[in-house]
Amino acid sequence: MAKNIQAIRGMNDYLPGETAIWQRIEGTLKNVLGSYGYSEIRLPIVEQTPLFKRAIGEVTDVVEKEMYTFEDRNGDSLTLRPEGTAGCVRAGIEHGLLYNQEQRLWYIGPMFRHERPQKGRYRQFHQLGAEVFGLQGPDIDAELIMLTARWWRALGISEHVSLELNSIGSLEARANYRDALVAFLEQHQETLDEDCKRRMYTNPLRVLDSKNPDVQALLNDAPVLGDYLDDDSREHFTGLCKLLDAAGIAYTVNQRLVRGLDYYNRTVFEWVTNSLGSQGTVCAGGRYDGLVEQLGGRATPAVGFAMGLERLVLLVQAVNPEFIASPVVDIYLVAAGAQTQSAAMTLAERLRDEMPGVKLMTNHGGGNFKKQFARADKWGARIALVLGESEVADGTVVVKDLRSGEQTAVAQDSVAAHLRTLLG
């Protein structure tokens, strides 16, 4: 017998019961994006490797350790996208969407990173991202955060996420801070683990992300990035905080929040949760005013965020299961008798025309009443329609509420109105 071929570790199948949950959550996210004027852009999952090296930074963990990179038959180096912003910027430059224009874009799809699979973090994972180009004030940063806060309210998880903010300033301000941080770390190398010692000279701001408790204790005495901010960045951040205060959005300023990608400047933020065990990031983003020019376009201010959908789905399932308790099928049509199948299918098509969005399944494969009602239960139907030969003859159908057990015969011409009342 041939050996079964299984999915690659860290790359998961999502089965019908799971995809229904994803679709409900994604539909909510997309509706909110539309209400803020965002348009969808669809991007390739494979890009030229230099795109990510230039955008993300060659000495980041993503580029050094996590990218899926390969040569194609022409010898070109290609990479499965590890994130969405770089590809979105590349597309904007290539198609002339950015210079002297305002764009509000969103995308959704799989990303790929070769890291250790764990709950909510996989090698193929899904992100929804939003990017704004052409606006540089703190007001658009605030609106993006307000948009995400509206998501949490719509999903019923507002009480289980919290917002952390920081400003990492301009490129020059970060360079000055980097020098001060390296000088401090050099004086305390005995406390650093090997990973932090390596990062100290390649990307010292990443030391601030260390989970090592000894390093975290040491960093309590380290220089603070906020002390090195340029005046424009400080003014920008103050403006953002005032707008969030006015909107009633609570936040914590986290001076160690720097993000893992090199293209960020000024505003960075994360929505985090403690409701999935250890603290985890649900959504994160910030401003990246230099990236468009860095990738070959004209200088264009930009800000955006990305959200991991696997972690969001887990969070909604954990804290608001009622949101996703939606049946696969609203109505199950039971056809009793050999001569009724054609009439049943005709009635089902008419109801789909008259009730757009209703989830109606017609029984196929025969079976007695008991078997057909068992199938209706399996699919989670709320209502069964029973069509026998006598109902076909007199133009009626029996409508049975599978929760209360009540049933009544209704004329086929008026059954749609009756069903709308039952389904609410």
From Swiss-Prot:
Compartment list: Cytoplasm
Pfam families according to UniProt: HGTP_anticodon, tRNA-synt_His
UniProt keyword terms in alphabetical order: Aminoacyl-tRNA synthetase, ATP-binding, Cytoplasm, Ligase, Nucleotide-binding, Protein biosynthesis
Reactions this protein catalyses: tRNA(His) + L-histidine + ATP = L-histidyl-tRNA(His) + AMP + diphosphate + H(+)
Domain of life: Bacteria
One Gene Ontology CC term in the entry: cytoplasm
Alphabetical list of Gene3D superfamilies matching this protein: Anticodon-binding domain, Bira Bifunctional Protein, Domain 2
GO molecular function: ATP binding; histidine-tRNA ligase activity
Listed InterPro entries: aa-tRNA-synth_II, aa-tRNA-synth_II/BPL/LPL, Anticodon-bd, Anticodon-bd_dom_sf, His-tRNA-ligase, HisRS-like_core, HisRS/HisZ, HisRS_anticodon
Protein name: Histidine--tRNA ligase
Organism: Salmonella paratyphi A (strain ATCC 9150 / SARB42)
